[in-house]
Amino acid sequence: MQSIRFGFWSLASCCVALFAAGCSKPAPTKADKVRIAYFPNITHAAALHAAATGGFQKSVGGAIKVEERVFTAGPAEVEALFASEVDFGYIGPGPAINGYLKSNGQALEIIDVAASGGASLIAAKGRSIKSVNDLAGKRVAVPQTGGTQDISLRHALKAIGLAGKDKGGTVDIVQYAPADVLDLFRRGELDAAWLPEPWVSRIIKDAGATLVTDERTLWPKGKFATAVVIVRKDFAKANPDIVAKLLTAHRASVDAINADKKSAGSVISKQIAKLSQGKTLSADILDASFSRTDITYEALDESVLTFADWAKDLGYLKKGRDGFGGLIQHGNR
């Protein structure tokens, strides 16, 4: 078991290499395939559903090959997009913001929302952790440094005067893939974790964890973008028709999920099992996951810009919301 190696600073290095001044790149060309990235998470339910039902492939037609790229954290997905290995993807707002700024706005844009909510702080069995205030001196996992849950955790800590050890504080923030977090909770090697669904619900059931903070309680009206849809700018410029068709498929899956969560949940569970080589999610885990996650394409721009402000405040970025005028493209909605 290993923690994920790619983090915010490797992302920054990658950007410098790819977007340095004077760096030439080939002109955008019409595509005969599209690489779609997403996570095996409930917050990416629309992607899981569209992939499993053939929605993406049907939308673009037989002449365009749809290839799936599966990730467990956003910074690694952004690195793949920088390397032109991803064209269209589902990701948390944190890595999308980082990628946009580090590429001087050249690499990507957000064109829709995929989920609101669906992230929480949980504590390992037997730990006396009732709130974020109790994390001092504790070992807390996030999917990846610089990712959306990492930013949320560090912001919550800073708000009460705490910080990670890497910033001179006492909280040991470590990065692990969610599946590894489950094993570490079972072995008692972690105190807490800030994770997306279905891992929150699964670890509560399978490892006896307790829910400490549902992140929705920290946001106005309980709404914030947990997952957004991004597109590689060069791909979108050369293939606006493909992007429009994929967005139609995305929204169709969002609508299908909300129309019948039981049926859609079964499809999504099987897809997660297929991708993670694990078992399907039980009905109670699915129900709990969906109860904390709103699968939606509602515009939640303010929350995305708030993540930018938080990332700046944490020292991840040099600019806050004022540096992201072209990040969210409503014209592509």
Task: Name each region found by the language model.
Residues 54-64, 217-221, 290-300:
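Short, solvent-exposed loop/beta-turn-alpha elements that line the ligand-binding surface or hinge
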